[in-house]
């Protein structure tokens, strides 16, 4: 074992120990001296990691948060995602220098928090909530009822009653646990409810596939849309148990018209039923050159206008730009796509709240690292995309000052 490997092992063990300790401390007690001790442990872990890893890069120009600082009343908000295992890595350092709004990956999903009856897993979620509080970050919890669910929920013999009980316990438990945390501002309530073809995304036989078992709870037969019962029920529970939270309807895909037509009708269905909904989210996992495909930018423009016309926020929640096509997947093309999306959001900030969240801060931290979808390569060096976004934010900052 060499010296660098030893440092990595120590860092991982110390972060794990701190997270395990946090599991046993009630949230209401985490402003006390006990919390300070644990965060001293995490700081030590970070120091060890920095000795073992490359430092975050020295970047040219103003950092993002200086150009577009977060304010609770801001109309244009920027944020980023990094995960619990990335504490103490250069990704954390990049985030600290550029962002003030954190979405901690998948630590809050059903599969992690309440995968089956009588089983709860709060370690990573609690650690990230406490971390954000200690650093003064605002949070969005990516905690939707969605296809990213546990194997227990996917089992073919699962009954509607069992699924509904697990859903209600999970959503109520999550909102109750963090309802006193004022820095937790948004939560993704549902995600990936509709296919690109405009159908309700449903279950598949077996376990381990990308599927949505929650539609088995049933459908609202009183409405022509026949929306799945779980959608409205999830929003109702989140509103009841998380009264300070802003609730988002998040959707994957591109700008497929059948998908968004159904999503819009679903949002109106919730509003007509006086169910709280505060924003619409689009994941924005796209390939380089996406903005050059005819109709895409026009459809995005119309979607944002439609959202703002209902006094809702519009969020780009998980932006990656894949460099997966050898013909078009260049750094220049990726930078142009990031630039186009962020520019469109900045334009609409005059009419309503827009939020841009970039998904991960290193190519090796995403689910498909071979697609190189982030603004930083596997050595945490910035790509042209970083400077393209920086330029958009600089122009926005200058325009606001005029």
Predicted segments with their positions:
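Substrate-binding cleft and catalytic face of glycoside hydrolase catalytic domains
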Residues: 97, 101-115, 124-248, 252-254, ...
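Boundary/entry segment of secreted carbohydrate-active catalytic domains
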Residues: 54-101, 105
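Bacterial N-terminal signal peptides
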Residues: 36-47
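Glycoside hydrolase catalytic-domain groove-lining segments
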Residues: 224-250, 257-326, 346, 352
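Aromatic-rich peripheral "rim/lid" segments of glycoside hydrolase catalytic domains that contact
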Residues: 188, 192-222, 237, 291, ...
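Short, acidic/polar
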Residues: 84-96, 166-174, 258-270, 338-342
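Structural preference for beta-strand elements that scaffold enzyme active sites
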Residues: 75-79, 101, 138-140, 184-188, ...
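Acidic-and-aromatic substrate-binding clefts and catalytic sites of carbohydrate-active enzymes
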Residues: 80-92, 110-123, 194-197, 253-263, ...
């Amino acid at each position: 074992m060499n010296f660098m490997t030893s440092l990595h092992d120590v860092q991982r063990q110390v972060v794990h120990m701190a997270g395990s300790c946090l599991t046993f401390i009630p949230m209401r007690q985490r402003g006390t001296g006990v919390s300070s001790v644990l965060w001293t442990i995490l700081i030590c872990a970070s120091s060890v990691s920095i000795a073992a890893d490359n430092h975050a890069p020295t970047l040219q120009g103003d950092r993002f948060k200086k150009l577009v600082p977060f304010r609770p009343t801001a109309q244009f908000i920027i944020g980023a995602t990094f995960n619990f295992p990335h504490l103490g890595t250069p990704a954390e350092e990049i985030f600290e220098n550029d962002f003030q709004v954190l979405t901690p990956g998948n630590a809050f999903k059903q599969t992690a928090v309440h995968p089956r009856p009588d089983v709860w897993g709060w370690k990573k979620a609690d650690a990230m909530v406490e971390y954000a509080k200690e650093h003064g970050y605002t949070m969005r919890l990516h905690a939707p009822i969605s296809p990213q669910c546990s194997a227990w929920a996917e089992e073919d013999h699962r009954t509607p009653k069992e699924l509904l009980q697990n859903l209600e316990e999970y959503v109520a438990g999550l909102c109750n646990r963090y309802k006193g945390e004022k820095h937790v501002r948004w939560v993704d309530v549902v995600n990936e409810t509709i296919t690109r073809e405009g159908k309700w995304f449903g279950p598949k036989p077996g376990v381990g596939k990308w599927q949505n078992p929650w539609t088995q709870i049933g459908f609202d037969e009183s409405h022509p849309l026949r929306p799945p019962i779980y959608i409205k029920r999830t929003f109702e529970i989140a509103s009841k148990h998380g009264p300070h939270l802003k609730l988002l309807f998040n959707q994957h895909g591109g700008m497929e018209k059948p998908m968004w037509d159904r999503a819009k009708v679903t949002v109106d269905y919730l509003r007509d039923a006086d169910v709280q909904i505060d924003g619409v989210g689009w994941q924005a996992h796209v390939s380089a050159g996406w903005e050059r495909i005819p109709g895409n930018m026009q459809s995005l423009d119309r979607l944002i206008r439609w959202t703002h016309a209902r006094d809702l926020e519009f969020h780009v929640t998980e932006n990656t730009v894949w460099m997966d096509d050898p013909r078009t997947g260049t750094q220049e093309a990726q930078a142009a796509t990031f630039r186009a999306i962020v520019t469109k959001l900045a334009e609409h900030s005059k009419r309503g709240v827009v939020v841009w969240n970039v998904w991960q801060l290193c190519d090796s931290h995403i689910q498909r690292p071979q697609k190189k979808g982030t603004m930083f390569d596997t050595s945490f060096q910035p790509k042209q995309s970083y400077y393209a976004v920086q330029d958009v934010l600089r122009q926005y900052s200058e325009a606001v000052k005029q």
